[in-house]
């Protein structure tokens, strides 16, 4: 008798995606982050659902409803901090997942990569709107500053900002619509994830060498299911350590003060995972230029397939580009640090130099080093 998982219309899809999927035998732990991101999304949707049962999206009661969740709801504090720190875990996994893709040349799977870039934008938008919901000082002023950036768009800027606000300032209408979008976007993300996987399974996974692995494939289950479970256990251990011992480590103390339009916090800054982009935004003195640089800092990922000059896919055997890659990683850490610092000397010039370096490495140096490496191997004939 044929196995039901191979014949049933629904189980057949699951079987081809997670059980009998032919997978390269040599993929390392860097390939674990896809499943970890799926786990993060599941955690965020579930905790978010339970938070939404008790949250009220009204400027008068939003802050106190979050306090009520933490104090009066059974395990509300746990759900709230799992959701807040789960977002940080989400971004840690996202950055590592994208970094893996850049290192091993996974961006040559164009459709998968582009859906991934769209997913990154969607997750960033969701996280930004979620940060506004507790209606603390940093929520309010973060929303004001970031939405205000759209006013830099010529002609329609001001109208666009007021349309997004639903009035002449960030107020009740803004909070309500942000809650609505924050609720719906994760489900759109989940749908995009399915499309992301669909395109990935058209080509099969990449591997550390960047070479074709058709000659050496193994079934996903049990080899990679058990490997993914180990990754999930490690991630959940780290998340729960954060939640139970250091719940406010990555948050801003200003957000424990209710939103007050009459009192601006001394340093308005986003959550840590946006600081690198925020530093790039601030490093350009012109408002429109800053906004364009901010968008381009993420959108540049979509250009990677066109900037690939080497005849080798992965950086595994390319020491010059490898060095540039790790300089880029260090550069992003510097940008993250600068984004959290006040706008004063020497932070301004450091931020500007780091921003120039960021774009130079990706747009100029890495493509050149790819050509040089090919010449050194006499592959440019």
UniProtKB/Swiss-Prot annotation:
Name of the molecule in the record? Cytochrome b
- Enumerate the cofactors the protein uses: heme b
* CDD domains in the record: cytochrome_b_C, Cytochrome_b_N
Q: Where does a ubiquinone bind?
A: 201
Q: Which Pfam families match?
A: Cytochrom_B_C, Cytochrome_B
Localisation: Mitochondrion inner membrane
Q: Which GO terms describe its biological process?
A: mitochondrial electron transport, ubiquinol to cytochrome c
Q: How is the cofactor bound?
A: Binds 2 heme b groups non-covalently.
Protein's membrane topology: Multi-pass membrane protein
Task: Provide the binding site for heme b b566.
Answer: 97, 196
- Residues in a coiled coil are none
The free-text function statement in the UniProt record for this protein reads:
Component of the ubiquinol-cytochrome c reductase complex (complex III or cytochrome b-c1 complex) that is part of the mitochondrial respiratory chain. The b-c1 complex mediates electron transfer from ubiquinol to cytochrome c. Contributes to the generation of a proton gradient across the mitochondrial membrane that is then used for ATP synthesis.
Regions that span the bilayer:
33-53, 77-98, 113-133, 178-198, 226-246, 288-308, 320-340, 347-367
Please provide one cellular component term from the Gene Ontology annotations of this protein.
Answer: respiratory chain complex III
Sequence positions that bind heme b b562: 83, 182
* Source organism of this protein record: Apodemus uralensis (Herb field mouse)
Where mainly located? mitochondrion
In the UniProt record, does the keyword Iron occur?
yes
The miscellaneous annotation reads: Heme 1 (or BL or b562) is low-potential and absorbs at about 562 nm, and heme 2 (or BH or b566) is high-potential and absorbs at about 566 nm.
């Amino acid at each position: 008798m044929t196995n039901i998982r191979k014949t049933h219309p629904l189980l057949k899809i699951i079987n081809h995606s997670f059980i009998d999927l032919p997978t390269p035998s040599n993929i390392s732990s860097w390939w674990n982050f896809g499943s970890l991101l799926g786990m993060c999304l599941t955690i965020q949707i579930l905790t978010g659902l339970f938070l939404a049962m008790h949250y009220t999206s009204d400027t008068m009661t939003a802050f106190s409803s979050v306090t009520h969740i933490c104090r009066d709801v059974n395990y509300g504090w746990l759900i709230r901090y799992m959701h807040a720190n789960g977002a940080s875990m989400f971004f840690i996994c996202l950055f590592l997942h994208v970094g893996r893709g850049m290192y091993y040349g996974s961006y040559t799977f164009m459709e998968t990569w582009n859906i991934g870039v769209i997913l990154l934008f969607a997750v960033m938008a969701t996280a930004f709107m979620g940060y506004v919901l507790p209606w603390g000082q940093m929520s309010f002023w973060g929303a004001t500053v970031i939405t205000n950036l759209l006013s830099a768009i010529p002609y329609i800027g001001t109208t666009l900002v007021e349309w997004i606000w639903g009035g002449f300032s960030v107020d009740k209408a803004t909070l309500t619509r942000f809650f609505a979008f924050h609720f719906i976007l994760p489900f759109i993300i989940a749908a995009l994830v399915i499309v992301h996987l669909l395109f990935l399974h058209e080509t099969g996974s990449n591997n550390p060498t960047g070479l074709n692995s058709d000659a050496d494939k193994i079934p996903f289950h049990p080899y990679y299911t058990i490997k993914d479970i180990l990754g999930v256990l490690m991630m959940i251990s780290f998340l729960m350590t954060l939640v139970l011992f250091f719940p406010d480590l990555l948050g801003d103390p200003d957000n424990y003060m209710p939103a007050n339009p009459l009192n601006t916090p001394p340093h308005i800054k986003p959550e840590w995972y946006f600081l690198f982009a925020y530093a790039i935004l601030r490093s350009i003195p012109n408002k429109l230029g800053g906004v364009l640089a901010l968008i381009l800092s993420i959108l540049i990922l979509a250009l990677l397939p066109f900037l690939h000059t080497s005849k080798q896919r992965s950086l595994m055997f390319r020491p010059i580009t490898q060095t540039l890659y790790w300089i880029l990683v260090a550069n992003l850490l510097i940008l993250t640090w600068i984004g959290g610092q006040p706008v004063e000397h020497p932070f301004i010039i450091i931020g500007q130099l780091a921003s120039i370096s960021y774009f130079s490495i990706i747009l100029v140096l890495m493509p050149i080093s790819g050509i040089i490496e090919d010449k050194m191997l006499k592959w440019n004939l």
